[in-house]
């Protein structure tokens, strides 16, 4: 074979090699593109499916929580005020709390990741407390108090402080009221926490400390026109109970 022929054959081999390599690259690129596209579709479907599932769970939780609240709001039997025939009633608040607690606990356990599930945890604590089961109530309030939702966390801490007061742990209650008084939660406004703290001091006989807090609230809780707010009015009554008892003499 002469040199010219050899060169032609060599070029042909190079062309075949390049063509083969190009085909392989194209096929590999196409395969990767398809895999990437399929993966993207799977991710999108998973996201849509996950959202749909979450919405379904949320709706279930809302319905279950609503049913538990209906039980909790059931009227108590009052012989002096007969209820219409067929109206469900409970003989006592403790009996009602026990019935509602069963449902709140179930909602909290089954739908704990939803907003209604977290609210159910809080109301489980409330109903445990009404039943006199302080241990489980404390656990529920602590769990609620650790929530990422600041409004819900404030409710949990406020109820926990109340429980501490009822179980002679005033120092722990004071710590929580001071924390809430520095907060911004709409569910437990700072002024409310300050009022609760002042009332605790008053119950301990620490009248001067209570009066200092009432005086701060009285001066601070006013609108832009200087009109006293609800907390200011309560503080004024606490500072001057005689005037509050006989408003006509002012």
Question: In which residue ranges do the predicted regions lie?
Answer:
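N-terminal positive-inside, membrane-proximal cytosolic segments immediately preceding the first
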Residues: 1-38
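Short solvent-exposed coil/turn linkers within tandem alpha-helical repeat scaffolds
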Residues: 107-117, 131, 145-154, 181-190, ...
């Amino acid at each position: 074979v002469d040199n010219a022929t050899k060169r032609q054959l060599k070029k042909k081999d190079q062309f075949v090699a390049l063509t083969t390599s190009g085909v392989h690259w194209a096929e590999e690129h196409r395969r990767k593109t398809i895999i990437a596209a399929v993966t993207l579709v799977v991710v999108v479907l998973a996201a849509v499916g996950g959202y749909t599932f979450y919405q379904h769970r949320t709706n279930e939780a809302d319905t279950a929580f609503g049913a538990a609240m209906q039980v909790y709001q059931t009227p108590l039997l009052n012989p002096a005020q007969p209820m219409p025939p067929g109206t469900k009633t409970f003989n006592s608040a403790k009996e009602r709390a026990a019935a509602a607690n069963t449902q709140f606990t179930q909602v909290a356990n089954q739908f704990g990741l939803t907003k209604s599930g977290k609210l159910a945890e809080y109301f489980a604590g409330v109903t445990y407390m009404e039943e006199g089961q302080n241990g489980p109530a404390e656990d529920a309030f602590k769990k609620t108090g650790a929530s990422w939702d600041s409004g819900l966390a404030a409710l949990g801490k406020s109820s926990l402080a109340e429980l501490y007061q009822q179980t002679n742990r005033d120092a722990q209650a004071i710590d929580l009221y001071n924390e809430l008084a520095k907060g911004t939660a709409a569910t437990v406004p700072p002024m409310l926490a300050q009022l609760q703290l002042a009332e605790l001091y008053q119950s301990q006989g620490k009248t001067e400390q209570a009066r200092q807090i009432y005086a701060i609230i009285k001066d601070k809780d006013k609108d832009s026109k200087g009109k006293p707010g609800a907390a200011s009015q309560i503080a004024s009554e606490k500072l001057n109970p005689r005037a509050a008892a006989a408003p006509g003499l002012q």
